[in-house]
């Protein structure tokens, strides 16, 4: 999430990126965590909240703009209830969105219109481990020609986090999981204990780790490295078998902002007349067809429960098998973009809710933890040098450094 504060514009398209993430990802996840706590479900989860995002979530001006955005969403959904009154299926969905937007407003007000108040609470309760990130989401390995630039990125991130959360960060999400040699030395200087890496950083480490990504490794500077598990990753990310592509889930690309008559939708889109997403989407994925069917919330929630059960069963079997071949506790690290949960995959927060609840049931033999607690409980890990890598295509830097953009790096390094 880039820094998108534009008071010089009456209606900023970029600010809507933040507002959409707040309504579709962060507030729904806050609601999930609150309900789990209320129901006495023991859980631990880890989230990266970048310095720019923390700053924006605390910004009074942006919060005022978000409140206006949310009130507009409620107003639009109320008009949709009227507009769709002759279509029973659409009218039911219009009521669903109206109730949803009002619930989002209630949660927003509950935390005094500062979402970091919620995340700080979860941090204090020990259910949420908040990771920092580099100050401006810089791909750090491409800045090694100027090491002081990398140091400034980490120093600023740690300072920003400490001022906002109230203590220093224990872990960091390196942008795009991008690692290169000696980066851990700078992380150690600023008190970072661990980071998350792409699986190849572990699998191709030297010497080769005994247990692959099922345990972290330690760099020679004492920084623990947790590798992404690819089996659990594919079950969510894969365009062929990933859960979010199920035909019963909500279709992302069909929004009334693009389909409703301009004279009707104009007050709710960009004031320049640019059609944009409103968050009200009436169709399900259906399949590879333009003839989409109406979204059925009840059927989508049934699929959420099925997929959460499948995911929990898979992790249970995976860990039970690993235990038979290990003399230490195996760990599965499942990192995903936060925006997947609620924005791209509308039902994503519901999936997290169901998975955590199933993980607390007796039939699962594992427990949810976070990287820092795992280190405390398993302080002896293999020392190995992680392989330079990213979680981008080919696990290298080519997405960010290639013939289409290499010219800019000379200018950046000046």
Label the model's feature ranges:
Residues 34-42, 114-132, 151, 162, ...:
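Acidic (Asp/Glu)-rich catalytic clusters
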Residues 139, 192-205, 367-370:
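His/Asp/Glu-enriched short active-site or ligand-binding loop at hydrolase and phosphoryl-transfer sites
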Residues 1-42, 49-90, 99, 206-414:
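Active-site and substrate-binding clefts of carbohydrate-active enzymes
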Residues 45-47, 130-133, 170, 194-197, ...:
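Hydrophobic faces of well-ordered beta-strands that scaffold small-molecule active sites
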């Amino acid at each position: 999430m880039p820094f998108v504060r534009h008071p010089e514009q009456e209606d900023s398209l970029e600010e809507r990126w933040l507002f959409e993430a707040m309504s579709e990802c962060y507030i729904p996840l806050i609601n999930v965590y609150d309900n789990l706590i209320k129901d006495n479900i023991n859980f631990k989860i880890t989230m990266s909240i970048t310095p720019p995002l923390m700053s924006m979530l605390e910004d009074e001006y942006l919060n005022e703009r978000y409140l206006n955005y949310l009130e507009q969403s409620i107003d639009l959904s109320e008009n949709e209830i009227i507009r769709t009154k002759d279509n029973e299926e659409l009218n039911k969905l219009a009521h669903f969105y109206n109730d949803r937007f009002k619930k989002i407003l209630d949660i927003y007000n509950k935390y005094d219109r500062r979402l970091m108040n919620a995340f700080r609470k979860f941090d204090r309760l020990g259910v949420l481990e908040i990771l920092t990130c580099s100050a401006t989401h810089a791909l750090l390995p491409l800045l090694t020609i100027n090491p002081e630039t990398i140091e400034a990125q980490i120093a600023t991130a740690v300072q920003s986090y400490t001022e906002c959360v109230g203590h220093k960060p224990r872990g960091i999400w390196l942008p795009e999981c991008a690692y290169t040699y000696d980066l851990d030395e700078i992380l150690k200087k600023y008190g970072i204990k661990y980071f998350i890496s792409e699986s190849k950083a572990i699998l191709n480490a030297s010497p080769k780790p005994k247990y692959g990504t099922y345990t972290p490794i330690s760099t020679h500077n004492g920084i623990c490295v947790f590798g992404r598990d690819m089996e659990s990753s594919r079950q969510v990310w894969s365009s062929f078998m990933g859960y979010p592509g199920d035909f019963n889930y909500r279709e992302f690309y069909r929004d009334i902002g693009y389909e409703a008559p301009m004279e009707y939708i104009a007050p709710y889109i960009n004031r320049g007349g640019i059609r944009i997403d409103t968050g009200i989407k009436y169709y399900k994925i259906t399949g590879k067809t333009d003839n989409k069917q109406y979204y059925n919330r009840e059927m989508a929630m049934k699929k959420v429960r099925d997929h959460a059960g499948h995911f929990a069963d898979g992790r249970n079997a995976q860990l039970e098998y690993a235990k038979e071949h290990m003399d230490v506790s195996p760990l599965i690290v499942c990192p995903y973009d936060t925006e997947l949960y609620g924005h791209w995959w509308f039902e994503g927060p519901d999936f997290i809710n169901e998975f955590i609840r199933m993980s607390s049931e007796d039939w699962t033999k594992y427990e949810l933890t976070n990287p820092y607690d795992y280190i405390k409980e398993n302080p002896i890990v293999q020392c190995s040098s992680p392989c330079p890598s990213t979680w981008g295509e080919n696990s290298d830097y080519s997405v960010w450094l290639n013939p289409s953009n290499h010219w800019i790096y000379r200018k950046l390094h000046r």
